[in-house]
């Protein structure tokens, strides 16, 4: 019987991830080929649990050589290439199998898969990026890899192949900080690049991959230099040129080189107006410059173009499917927040959550707005429509969010759905007892404290609030880690608040701690305590932070009253003036926003978007002339942009 799929992998010291990878694919692959380049851990022993085809290969600083060795052992009709730090969602395996069973093999036709990478400290705190890469192709056609690093797939004559999108997604954890450091990937890759430069010199693709290396390390100056060299030397039909231009655009924006970003946008992406990338990039540039109406128009076009194309083809994007979904939707949500448009906030939150129901920040934003305008039963109904087939993980997350909003009824609703109460965190038990006014429940939760709870600052915050609420010295139970100096400072600060002996200088030095305490009291609906301690901890810095907190949480009347206090004392900062300007613009009183924008620019002349807002909303020509001149002197790159010139 002909084997349908051969999985080919090269590995070295992958004992922490290879089992996850192989278990995710073992039900799909008819043959698993493992080429080991020198493991000293249990990698091979784990691999032997899944296959007898484990081969040793002497590492020669050449990924292509190792990859091609693995391909030489494959006997399946199709070849899939994975790395050990990648894995499939097992629910997708049946769809994958149907695809390769039904797909007609054509000469020199290769397939890209979608790779979702987690980048950051850990999966929980990671940023998620999505890219495509050729990993699936028919066997026995001479298709092989070339270049020692960031290897590419070519045909038997060494010619790059055209790529077709496959409906396959894998997940990649190799960019997590611990993995990068442990495997010393950057130094390993640098050594390979050095050898390559000495032996044969660099081709444009090498400069592109070197740029990727620097970008991963966060060295964007060197990354941009490499990307620019690659872009300048490359043929316009190179398959990676769009990725290179995208990276250049992103770094230009990071360096405030907006005109250069505009140029690369139109030089490359304007040729693809039916795809989302052009409009998503343009929308992000408009938003950055403070031109929100143009930004919304472009971002909506990106989203709608992707929707229209996706009904015709799987390949509805040029670089990354997120440019047709999460990227424009997230930016549209951000603008809706600036404009305080609750209907649009709800709409965009729901759209984002339909793609990723575990986006904590977006879910929290949605719930914040829903609780302002909907009954508790209506809120639950909306959540249940978004998060379908809810799991225990969902109940725990929703319980946590509604606790943070001080909504004990809905929090209790989701708590009752949690089957194993031991999964509820100590933090959530403590806050639950506070909003339910149960001192006994709080005491019982305290008994569960463990030394590792010292790394959670919210536990100490809950203990402090309980001390104030019940006038009980729970503060003696504060938990700390090895940072003794910081611990003593926090304890001293809390003691002064409790004893009403706090000085203004103490507040200045600990303003974040004070603001967190007061805003949490408000969130938990401990209004009596809030009123007491806002008087005791009254300081312009605290009032400013609270005013902004109220404004961004749609407590407009409270925000305005706090801003008025600051105006009376002449203590308003630029963020307050900006929020008041937006408040007037959003209410249709653009002329009244101008004085607030003027004050904001005085305090923050580096706020480039403020000048756009001024030129858009000011009617007085003398004012416009003055700020156009200042804008030109401070931001020469900006005023070269066509849409800025027209203001």
Give the ranges of each region predicted by the language model.
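Generic helix N-cap/helix-start motif at coil->alpha-helix transitions
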Residues: 201-207, 238-245, 273-279, 290, ...
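Acidic helix N-cap motif at the loop->helix transition within catalytic regions
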Residues: 16-19, 41-50
């Amino acid at each position: 019987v002909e084997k349908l799929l051969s999985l080919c992998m090269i590995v070295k010291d992958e004992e922490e991830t290879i089992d996850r990878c192989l278990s995710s694919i073992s039900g799909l692959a008819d043959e698993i080929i493992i080429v080991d380049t020198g493991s000293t851990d249990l990698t091979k022993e784990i691999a032997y649990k899944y296959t007898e085809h484990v081969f040793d290969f002497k590492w020669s600083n050449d990924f292509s050589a190792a990859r091609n060795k693995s391909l030489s052992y494959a006997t399946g009709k199709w070849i899939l290439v994975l790395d050990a730090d990648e894995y499939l969602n097992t629910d997708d395996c049946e769809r994958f199998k149907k695809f390769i069973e039904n797909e007609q093999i054509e000469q020199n036709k290769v397939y890209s898969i979608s790779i979702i990478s987690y980048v950051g400290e850990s999966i929980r705190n990671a940023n998620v990026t999505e890219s495509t890469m050729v990993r699936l192709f028919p066997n026995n056609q001479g298709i092989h890899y070339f270049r020692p690093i960031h290897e590419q797939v070519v045909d038997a004559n060494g010619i790059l192949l055209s790529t077709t999108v496959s409906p396959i997604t894998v997940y990649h954890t190799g960019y997590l900080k611990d993995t990068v450091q442990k495997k010393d990937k950057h130094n390993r890759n640098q050594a390979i690049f050095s050898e390559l430069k000495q032996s044969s010199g660099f081709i444009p693709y090498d400069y592109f991959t070197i740029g990727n290396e620097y970008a991963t390390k966060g060295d964007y100056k060197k990354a941009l230099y490499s990307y620019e060299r690659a872009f300048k030397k490359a043929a316009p039909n190179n398959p990676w040129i769009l990725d290179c231009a995208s990276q250049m655009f992103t770094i230009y924006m990071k360096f405030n080189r907006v005109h250069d970003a505009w140029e690369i946008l139109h030089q490359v992406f304007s040729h693809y107006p039916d795809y989302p990338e052009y409009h998503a990039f343009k929308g992000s540039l408009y938003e950055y410059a403070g031109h929100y109406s143009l930004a919304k128009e472009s971002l909506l076009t990106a989203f709608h173009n992707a929707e229209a194309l996706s009904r015709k083809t799987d390949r509805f994007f040029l670089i990354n499917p997120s440019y047709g979904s999460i990227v424009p939707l997230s930016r549209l949500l951000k603008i809706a927040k600036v404009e305080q448009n609750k209907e649009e906030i709800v709409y965009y939150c729901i759209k984002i959550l339909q793609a990723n129901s575990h986006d904590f920040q977006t879910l929290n934003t949605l719930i914040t707005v829903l609780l302002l305008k909907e009954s508790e039963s209506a809120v639950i109904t909306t959540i249940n429509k978004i998060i379908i087939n809810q799991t225990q993980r969902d109940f725990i997350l929703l319980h946590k969010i509604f606790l943070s909003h001080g909504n004990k009824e809905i929090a209790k609703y989701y708590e009752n759905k949690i089957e194993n109460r031991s999964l509820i965190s100590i933090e959530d038990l403590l806050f639950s007892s506070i909003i339910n006014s149960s001192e006994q429940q709080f005491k019982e939760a305290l008994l569960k404290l463990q030394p590792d709870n010292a790394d959670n600052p919210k536990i100490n915050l809950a203990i402090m609030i309980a001390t104030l609420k019940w006038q009980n010295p729970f503060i003696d139970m504060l938990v700390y880690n090895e940072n003794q100096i910081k611990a003593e400072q926090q304890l001293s600060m809390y003691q002064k608040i409790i004893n009403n002996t706090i000085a203004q200088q103490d507040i200045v030095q600990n303003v974040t701690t004070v603001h967190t305490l007061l805003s949490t009291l408000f969130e938990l609906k401990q209004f009596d305590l809030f009123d007491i301690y806002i008087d005791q901890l009254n300081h312009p810095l605290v009032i400013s932070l609270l005013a902004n907190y109220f404004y961004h949480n749609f407590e407009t009347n409270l925000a305005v009253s706090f801003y008025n206090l600051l105006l009376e004392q002449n203590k308003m900062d630029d963020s307050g003036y900006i929020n008041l300007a937006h408040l007037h613009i959003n209410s249709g009183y653009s002329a009244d926003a101008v004085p607030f924008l003027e004050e904001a620019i005085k305090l923050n002349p580096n706020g480039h978007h403020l000048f756009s807002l001024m030129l858009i909303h000011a009617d007085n020509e003398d004012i416009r002339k003055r700020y156009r001149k200042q804008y030109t002197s401070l931001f020469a790159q900006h005023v070269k942009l066509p849409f800025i010139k027209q203001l």
